[in-house]
């Protein structure tokens, strides 16, 4: 529970959205309407440590795969993403973060 609250607090300054900031579907928790393009890579790394990845999963997979390669896209290793890698994708992925950790039992 503490990691979830910490992740939501990290995302709060980037939230520009409406009434329902979260959504759960098929064992995945989404936090939507967060401006990922304004995030520093250190924020993305911290969220990665807490179990969150940028984008909308399958919807952004091809974009990430095209920019960073299939190995990175499959690994979801956002704890160790570099500045250069983040700069390649941050303007082309959905304004959301998702987690398998908090979306399933």
Model-identified regions with their sequence ranges:
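Acidic interaction surfaces
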Residues: 1-105
């Amino acid at each position: 529970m503490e990691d979830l609250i910490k992740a939501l607090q990290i995302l709060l300054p980037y939230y520009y959205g409406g009434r329902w900031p979260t959504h759960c579907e098929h064992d995945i928790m989404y936090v939507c309407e967060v401006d990922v393009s304004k995030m520093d890579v250190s924020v993305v790394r911290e969220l990665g440590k807490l179990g969150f990845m940028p984008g909308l999963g399958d919807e952004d997979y091809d974009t990430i795969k095209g920019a960073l390669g299939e190995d990175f896209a499959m690994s979801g290793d956002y704890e160790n993403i570099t500045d250069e890698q983040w700069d390649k994708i941050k303007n082309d992925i959905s304004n959301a973060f998702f987690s398998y950790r908090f979306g399933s039992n």
